[in-house]
């Protein structure tokens, strides 16, 4: 069924068609090769914005550092990072004045979180800079490696499992004169294969101990690894993003917890809520401004854009904010929270992989690692790269660049939002003391500013005052990229507001289609996406019906499961036709077995197996839902699974879908080739880790799973749990006396082994 897309717009008001202009169909652009150039750009730009600051040298690492705080007041419209401490503190004080008790209450909430958070919180997240191996690893592996190294260096606070104790270890590790770490390396040998008699390269993985002195350790602990941000639509140039190591992550987490708690209490904050909740919050602010301006005032809205938000923020400013927010709190709490900004003031940016050179004539390729950029002859580089390297050279230490000012992307989203909101808060009439006043919305670096005044001059004066106030705290509103409109039409975080929010449907386009997990999950995810868009994004019934038909078509082509009576020939046609002929009730066959599609927009909430269950032949039911079916390696099935769907911008979001276990819920086996590489040791660690976690979850089914509080290890928790369960089972007669005795004996043996270790 092919559709003429113009039909979709016959009755659509112009503003609703905005979404069709978004660059969201097709594959997004990915980066290839090295991110070194983008990282150097970031470092150089950041220093340029703060160039009139004071230079100092870090006494521990010898890194040159630039401090722009309380620098010269701006004389032009160029972006700059010269925030004034007293202005930031005053903005905080006014924010507290208009929200009595907000900081106090958020501190109390955060203190509770700090005392309860387990160290496993750090296993969330994907790639993390692993300082022991000097490259990126999955978060869980990087954490395990860090704890292992700490343990072998006599730091044991983390064994209690509380994050705060792990952070104590981090602090102690920075005072040590040297640290001993285990690194992985590869040995290659040429050996003759017995079967084929050919020479093959055999790789073995060695682990070797290495000592790192205090300076090198500090550099690694303060390093952010950089990568190129992938899949960014609507941009010609790529940019660099940072991934911090385990030493920094825990501290950042607590600061962001505090800031999140504050943002939740601020009506102008677009974080941490999302989706419909966010729209409601924003609509409230707009309503407030429009209601007040109906009779006598004009009201205008700026769809705002800030120039290089991260690169003009400054960790020293965040330190000042935290010092103010936590004033009257216990000393230990203030210390824990001030460490993250202090570490960021001394951060180092790792330049990534370096450059790849190839000589066309000699067919040679060679990698110039970042470590060599400090000393290599610049004649090999083109002009723009040469300029970058010359500029960055004074900042280089061991292949990392000292980067004191600036924040790197996505590290303190919540805290920087608090700073932005504190400026919006100053727009109340009691602070402006004139006829104009403003309010607005802030979400990380994105903002919308609503200004009310009796006449146009007042509006202009209000905007100017806002612009200058922002400059004082290191926020640079871009005059080129911001635009102003009568209130009622603006854009904020890709939500388009036109007397109410317009559904920007194109943002959801990338999540339509077949996910490629397996036949069962893909069908379920596909219909759930359509259902969710009917609920949240104005996907009308006719379009939804069409989306469904296109999805089924796509699904059948992906899994080659066209209807049993179709003319289309594929590899699976023979089996599917045979099944079709043998089946009495053809309507009961799943689409993935060549059956008809019974979905329409009224029954999208029902999993396909349930929808067709009554229509299935009995022997088909028996084959389909048989856990003993030898051809399927099953996942353990929960009633609800999570799929990762890709909206057009923002992080991949998790979406729940119903999971009914059938023989179509297979999981592909892992690629074996990893076993011959340097990753093998890591893979084994990861599997070990996985096994321990699975075992732990067997002991604590999710219903009774309370994170153990207090100082017990996983093993102790499991042993005590086993004893309690065994006693209950024995007393209720579910197990015999001998079984009970055996369980008790095993528990004692485990405890004995732990004591001997």
From Swiss-Prot:
Its family remark reads: Belongs to the influenza viruses polymerase PB1 family.
| Ranges for region Promoter-binding site | 249-256
Q: Cite the record's Polar residues compositional bias ranges.
A: 55-64
The PTM entry states: Phosphorylated by host PRKCA.
In chain numbering, motif Nuclear localization signal lies across 187-195, 203-216
Please state where this protein is localized: Host nucleus; Host cytoplasm
Subunit structure of this entry?
A: Influenza RNA polymerase is composed of three subunits: PB1, PB2 and PA. Interacts (via N-terminus) with PA (via C-terminus). Interacts (via C-terminus) with PB2 (via N-terminus); this interaction is essential for transcription initiation.
Task: Please provide the record's keywords in A-Z order.
Answer: Eukaryotic host gene expression shutoff by virus, Eukaryotic host transcription shutoff by virus, Host cytoplasm, Host gene expression shutoff by virus, Host nucleus, Host-virus interaction, Inhibition of host RNA polymerase II by virus, Nucleotide-binding, Nucleotidyltransferase, Phosphoprotein, RNA-directed RNA polymerase, Transferase, Viral RNA replication, Viral transcription
| Annotated RdRp catalytic domain residues | 286-483
**One GO term (biological process):** symbiont-mediated suppression of host mRNA transcription via inhibition of RNA polymerase II activity
Q: What does this protein do?
A: RNA-dependent RNA polymerase which is responsible for replication and transcription of virus RNA segments. The transcription of viral mRNAs occurs by a unique mechanism called cap-snatching. 5' methylated caps of cellular mRNAs are cleaved after 10-13 nucleotides by PA. In turn, these short capped RNAs are used as primers by PB1 for transcription of viral mRNAs. During virus replication, PB1 initiates RNA synthesis and copy vRNA into complementary RNA (cRNA) which in turn serves as a template for the production of more vRNAs.
Which region ranges are annotated with the description Disordered? 50-82
Q: Which GO terms describe its cellular component?
A: host cell cytoplasm; host cell nucleus
In Swiss-Prot or TrEMBL terms, this protein is called RNA-directed RNA polymerase catalytic subunit
- Please name the gene that encodes this protein: PB1
- GO MF term list: nucleotide binding; RNA binding; RNA-directed RNA polymerase activity
- EC number annotated for this UniProt entry: 2.7.7.48
UniProt catalytic activity: RNA(n) + a ribonucleoside 5'-triphosphate = RNA(n+1) + diphosphate
Query: Where does the source fall among the domains of life?
Result: Viruses
Q: Does the keyword DNA-binding apply?
A: no
């Amino acid at each position: 069924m092919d559709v003429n897309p113009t039909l979709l717009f016959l009755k659509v008001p112009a503003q609703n068609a905005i979404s069709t202009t978004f660059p969201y169909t097709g594959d997004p652009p990915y980066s290839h090769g090295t991110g070194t150039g983008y990282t150097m750009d970031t470092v150089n730009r950041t220093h340029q914005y703060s160039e009139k600051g004071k230079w100092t040298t870090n006494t521990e690492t010898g890194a040159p550092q630039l401090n722009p705080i309380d620098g010269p007041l701006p004389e032009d419209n160029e972006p700059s990072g010269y925030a004034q401490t007293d202005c930031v503190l005053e903005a905080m004080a006014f924010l507290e004045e208009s929200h009595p008790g907000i900081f106090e209450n958020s501190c109390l909430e955060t203190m509770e979180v700090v005392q309860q958070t387990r160290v496993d919180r750090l296993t969330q997240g994907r790639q993390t800079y692993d300082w022991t191996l000097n490259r990126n690893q999955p978060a869980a592996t990087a954490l395990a490696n860090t704890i292992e190294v700490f343990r072998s260096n006599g730091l044991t606070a983390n064994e209690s499992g509380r994050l705060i104790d792990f952070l104590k270890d981090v602090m102690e590790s920075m005072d040590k004169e040297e640290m001993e770490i285990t690194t992985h390396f590869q040995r290659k040998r040429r050996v003759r294969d017995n079967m084929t008699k050919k020479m093959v390269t055999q790789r073995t993985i060695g682990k070797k101990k290495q000592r790192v002195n205090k300076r090198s350790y500090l550099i690694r602990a303060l390093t952010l690894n950089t990568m190129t941000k992938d899949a960014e639509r609507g941009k010609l140039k790529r940019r660099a993003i940072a991934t911090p190591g385990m030493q920094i992550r825990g501290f950042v987490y607590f600061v962001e917890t505090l800031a999140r708690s504050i943002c939740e209490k601020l009506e102008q904050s677009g974080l941490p809520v999302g989706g419909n909740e966010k729209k409601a919050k924003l609509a409230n602010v707009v309503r407030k401004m429009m209601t007040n301006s109906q009779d006598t005032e004009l009201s205008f809205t700026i769809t705002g854009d800030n120039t290089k938000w991260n690169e003009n923020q400054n960790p020293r400013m965040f330190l000042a904010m935290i010092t103010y927010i936590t004033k009257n709190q216990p000393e230990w709490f203030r210390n824990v929270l001030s460490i993250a900004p202090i570490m960021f003031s001394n951060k180092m940016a790792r330049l990534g992989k370096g450059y790849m050179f190839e000589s066309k004539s000699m067919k040679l390729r060679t990698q110039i690692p970042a470590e060599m950029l400090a000393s290599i002859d610049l004649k090999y580089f083109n002009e723009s790269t040469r300029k970058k390297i010359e500029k960055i050279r004074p900042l280089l230490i061991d292949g990392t660049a000292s980067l004191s000012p600036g924040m790197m992307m996505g590290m303190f989203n919540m805290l920087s939002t608090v700073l932005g909101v504190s400026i919006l808060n100053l727009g109340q009439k009691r602070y402006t003391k004139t006829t104009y006043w403003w309010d607005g919305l802030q979400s990380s670096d994105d903002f919308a500013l609503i200004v009310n005044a009796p006449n146009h001059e007042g509006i202009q004066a209000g905007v100017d005052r806002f612009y200058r106030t922002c400059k004082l705290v290191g926020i640079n509103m871009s005059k080129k990229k911001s635009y102003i409109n009568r209130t009622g039409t603006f854009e904020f975080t890709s939500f388009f507001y036109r007397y109410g929010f317009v559904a920007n449907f194109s943002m959801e386009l990338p999540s339509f289609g077949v996910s490629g997990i397996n036949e069962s999950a893909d069908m379920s995810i596909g219909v759930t996406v359509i259902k969710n868009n009917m609920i949240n994004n104005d996907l009308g019934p006719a379009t939804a019906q069409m989306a469904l038909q296109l999805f089924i078509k796509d699904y059948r082509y992906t899994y080659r499961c066209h209807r049993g009576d179709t003319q289309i020939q594929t590899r699976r046609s023979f089996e599917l036709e045979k099944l079709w002929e043998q089946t009495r009730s053809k309507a009961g066959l799943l689409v993935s077995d060549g059956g008809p599609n019974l979905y329409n927009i009224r029954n999208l909430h029902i999993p396909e197996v349930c929808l067709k269950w009554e229509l299935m032949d009995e022997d088909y039911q028996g084959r389909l839902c048989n856990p003993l079916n030898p051809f399927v390696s099953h996942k353990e099935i929960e009633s609800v699974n999570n799929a990762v769907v890709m909206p057009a911008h923002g992080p991949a979001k998790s979406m729940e879908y119903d999971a009914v276990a059938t023989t179509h819920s297979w999981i592909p086996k892992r690629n074996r080739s990893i076993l011959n590489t340097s990753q093998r040791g890591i893979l084994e660690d990861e599997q070990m880790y996985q096994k321990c976690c699975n075992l732990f979850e067997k002991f604590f089914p999710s219903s009774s799973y309370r994170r153990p509080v207090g100082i017990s290890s996983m093993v102790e928790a499991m042993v005590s749990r086993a004893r309690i369960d065994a006693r209950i089972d024995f007393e209720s007669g579910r197990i015999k006396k001998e079984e009970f005795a055996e369980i008790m004996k095993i528990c004692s043996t485990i405890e004995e082994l732990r004591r001997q270790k």
